[in-house]
Amino acid sequence: MEEYLITARSVTQAQRMAQLLERRGVRAVVGRVPMGLTGKGCGYVLRLRGREKAVAAWGLLREMGFSPAQVFQRWDDGYSEVEL
């Protein structure tokens, strides 16, 4: 299944976003940014399984006033930034 990563500005923001999504029925797991993904050193992401969940999460986060920075899709050979 496809995996999507939505970047967060801090661990606190990632945790808040995950909690709000959970309340809306969208499961997201908070994790560290994979090495070399953003070029900004350490960071946190929400991991979601499947494009449908990623699109739903992106819309809900924007609706709730969050401004997630980037979305990446995981491929066998790495990650690429995508638009939802």
Q: How would you name each of these model-derived features?
A:
Residues G50-L84:
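C-terminal structural segments of small proteins and small subunits
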